[in-house]
Amino acid sequence: MNNSGNQNINKKVFLQAKYFFLARLLQVIIVFGILILFSLRLSKENYGLYQGSWVFINLFAPLLFLGLPQQLLTLPGNGAISHFFWLLKKYFPYYVTAVLIFITTLFFLHQKFSIALLICIFICTLFQSVMLLMDNLVIKLNADLLFLKQNFLYSLLFLALHYAWLYAETDMEWLVVGIAFIGFLKSAAYFLFIRKLNLGVHLEVADTLYFEKQWKLLSLNEILNRFTTHADKLAIIFLLSISGFSVYYNGTYELPFFAMLVSALGNSLSVQLSNNNTGAKSAAALFKQSIVTGSSVAFPLFFFFYIFSTPVFQFFFNGKYMDSVPLFFFSIFIAFLRVLIFAVFLQVFKNNHTILFGSIIDLLVNIGSVVILYPFLGIDAFPAGFVIGTAFQIAYYIYKTKKLINAGIRDLIPLTWLLALIVALTLFYSLLFFILQPLQTWAIIGIAAIITTAIIYLLTHFFGSKINNKKTVTSLEHE
């Protein structure tokens, strides 16, 4: 592919990533704000019920359609709808089985959650699952502005619903049903849009054996990933009281800023690389560029939240959840690893079996680490095991990606940039914490947050952009 072609892809990738980022930004801010508000206003028991409900919704909503939502992003651009309906019809019995497994899982929680709340969780999960499916389908159809508008409207309704529920002081069931309803409204709007399009629903599906194989691999991988991500919280719900779970949840809450950034870059890369005949070296250069961009945002945020973790918990939770800080020390390290989105690269180049095996490694190492560390760390072993398992998974992905495109690690990862950034930020934030320590908590957080924002701006608009342009152009010229 020539330089102009790759430059067009680069521009489209990061323009689309901007839409994804903006679409998620308001929702992330609102969810984070609700977490803070509910932590302060609700009892630990009620807060645990609320977040426990979301654990099951977030775990099972992507699993009810198994690997279909993620596979939508890699289907052929001119036949996404026909492939979607073909997969939906062919594997309908599997989706029904997933629903039955979900119902069985909820049944074992009747001693900690009321039957009425469990029914509401089930209904909400169904609507959230459909919403996720429609979200990815709209992304695949490149309806970026519609995606942005609908997510903006959904976020506002989500906030209004929580605000009304908090001041109405009614049962948790009403809140969960309300979330299900606004999810239904969003999905209905997407459906009406797609229905108006002439997309060749009845086009013949080519290479059915390939798509069947990919669906199976993605389904297994989705199950493993979701279980690995939420297994610790499931275990804590059964092991501890609901109040104890609320402490664990706040300590291991994965800051949405990291997930949002990775999701935006990952979805955009997946869509653009699958829609264009991009060579391996060009894709590697684009991938390397995304790591520089991602680390320019994620690393300053990591050091801010890690170095200033105690003041952060004191300020936002008013000292109520200080028991969560030791858990946070372990779980925050996942931010370093999230930037390395090798699974996206492997998926685009049809290596889903590698992704699946990496997920198996992640799960086994995670469980093994928890078993080994639990006698020494207690419940802190759960977030530590999660980070260790993810590290082994990414190491495996790096090894397989190098073999796939016959490239060195420096062709994929900007090692010099990452190392220099880590050292510089470690020294800077350590010094900043020492300087700000005598101040009041609100002043410490405010000043550190402003400085972190400035650092991110400088990295993304000056240093990161220069490295991106230089490395990407050089790589493409030698292709």
Spell out what each predicted region is:
Residues 9-69, 158-159, 179, 183, ...:
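Signature of the first transmembrane helix
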Residues 97, 101-108, 116, 168, ...:
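Transmembrane alpha-helical segments of multi-pass transport proteins
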Residues 1-30, 71-73, 81, 145, ...:
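N-terminal membrane topogenesis motif
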Residues 31, 35, 62-80, 140, ...:
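Helix-loop junctions and terminal segments of transmembrane helices
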Residues 74-81, 127-150, 332-361:
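Membrane-interface junctions at transmembrane-helix termini in multi-pass inner-membrane proteins
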Residues 1-9, 13, 119, 145-150, ...:
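Interhelical loop/hinge segments that connect adjacent transmembrane helices in multipass membrane
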Residues 148-196, 360-368, 379-402, 444-456:
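Hydrophobic alpha-helical transmembrane segments
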Residues 15-28, 53-116, 280-301, 358, ...:
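Membrane-water interface segments that mark the loop-to-transmembrane alpha-helix transition
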